[in-house]
Amino acid sequence: KISGHFIQGHVDTTAKIRKINLTDKSWILRLELEDKKLKKFLVEKASISINGVSLTISKVTNDYFEIYVIPHTLKLTNLRYLNINNKVNVELDILCKYIYKYSN
């Protein structure tokens, strides 16, 4: 059985943290991709890796995307040290990239 997120460890681009909201101990991170051409690979509910941490995209707009970070993930990863305007490494969902490649 194959399950979970597919993360390879290959950084596709960076993103800048534009906003951090705290809700019930979870964080909502609003990020802006450095390479705008890669926005086509951002899909709500798709996987994304931020600084090597596999997460799920919760919202995508023309200008930014958002992810939720639960307390357990904050406690165990480097994400708890992030601040607004920090740059983070981004690995996009490999399945989104493959589907895009083979459908075009």
Regions found by a protein language model. Name each.
Residues 1-104:
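Conserved loop->alpha-helix
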